[in-house]
Amino acid sequence: MSLADSVLAVNNDLPIRTDKPVHSGKVRSVYWLTEADSARLIRERGYDVPADTPLAIMVISDRISAFDCIFHGEGDLRGIPGKGAALNAISNHWFGLFKENGLADSHILDIPHPFVWIVQKARPIKVEAIIRQYITGSMWRAYQKGERVFCGITLPEGLQKDQKLPELLITPSTKGILTGIPGVPEQDDVNISRADIEANFEAFGFEKKEDIDLYEKLLKEGFGVISEALAKLDQVFVDTKFEFGYVTDSNGNSKLIYMDEVGTPDSSRIWDGAAYRDGKIVENSKEGFRQFLLNHFPDPDILLNKDRMPEREALARDNALPLDAMMNVSRTYTGIAEKVTGRKIELSDNPKAEIIAILKEQYALVD
């Protein structure tokens, strides 16, 4: 097996039966099943959802994105070996722990393969639910320049880089481009305050104003569950991003759930505890890859300056990264996944062929 073959780089060309366009994100692709296949799987598999619930196959890839671009490595390596399986394994573990702790459900109904989730259709909240326990990254850069108010919250004077904050901070941003909301610019990923959400809760996708309290409660509780579990592994949960949505349960009631992925190296910063106590930062998340890129390219402003996006896209397209850098990221992702789950992340010889075989033979979703 070649290293490039073990990587699932293209995940939007699987022959899964669907009558809708495949939705391709930076890392995952979503295949909406036909009404007939959704109803059949709900019946055959006994999923605890209404009989007419639309289902989708969500396939993760091994692609790596940073600064809104997809990067690749030498030897035609179009992703990070083990990354997709590691991300799904970590999310599956945390979602299970949330359930054990009486928190909300997720959108996942079934896990046919390490790269694949069967999910129910959700109505997403249009908020990137970001929560921070330490001041670092973009927040520290802004604080250093004199900013003190973040998403309507005023931070005290005298904070130091990478310091633990006095309390958990919720610093939401917009998910997608939202139009017609007073005071909220019509662009992706804009910081917003709780007051913005309260004044326009329906525009942000909340069904009831009281659900803003519930989303914040689930955000803090989910963060707490992961933070406590990581602390036992001597890992520091620094900050993370959650996503939420509504689904209809088997009784026809609407309920708020966790969506997408949670507590992964892609959506979070995780630091090594021993190094942090020693005054050093050792990243066990994608932040390490971002820092590598900022040091690797001679003009890091291209990666940070939103006005230089065409140059950034060319940089990612035209530069194959060193193999050892790609494998360092692989070790970070598989290492933290194995710590969290207590199980080895196995590299597949040919993940695409495995996925097709399972979905054909066990789920009858491939003609």
UniProtKB/Swiss-Prot annotation:
GO terms for cellular component: cytoplasm. GO terms for molecular function: ATP binding; phosphoribosylaminoimidazolesuccinocarboxamide synthase activity. Keywords: ATP-binding, Ligase, Nucleotide-binding, Purine biosynthesis. It catalyses: 5-amino-1-(5-phospho-D-ribosyl)imidazole-4-carboxylate + L-aspartate + ATP = (2S)-2-[5-amino-1-(5-phospho-beta-D-ribosyl)imidazole-4-carboxamido]succinate + ADP + phosphate + 2 H(+). It is an enzyme of class 6 (ligase). The keyword Ligase applies. One of its GO terms (biological process) is 'de novo' IMP biosynthetic process. The keyword Disulfide bond does not apply. Pathway: Purine metabolism; IMP biosynthesis via de novo pathway; 5-amino-1-(5-phospho-D-ribosyl)imidazole-4-carboxamide from 5-amino-1-(5-phospho-D-ribosyl)imidazole-4-carboxylate: step 1/2. Its EC number is 6.3.2.6. Belongs to the SAICAR synthetase family. PANTHER family: PHOSPHORIBOSYLAMINOIMIDAZOLE-SUCCINOCARBOXAMIDE SYNTHASE (PTHR43700:SF1). This is Phosphoribosylaminoimidazole-succinocarboxamide synthase. It comes from Shewanella amazonensis (strain ATCC BAA-1098 / SB2B). The lineage of its organism: Bacteria, Pseudomonadati, Pseudomonadota, Gammaproteobacteria, Alteromonadales.
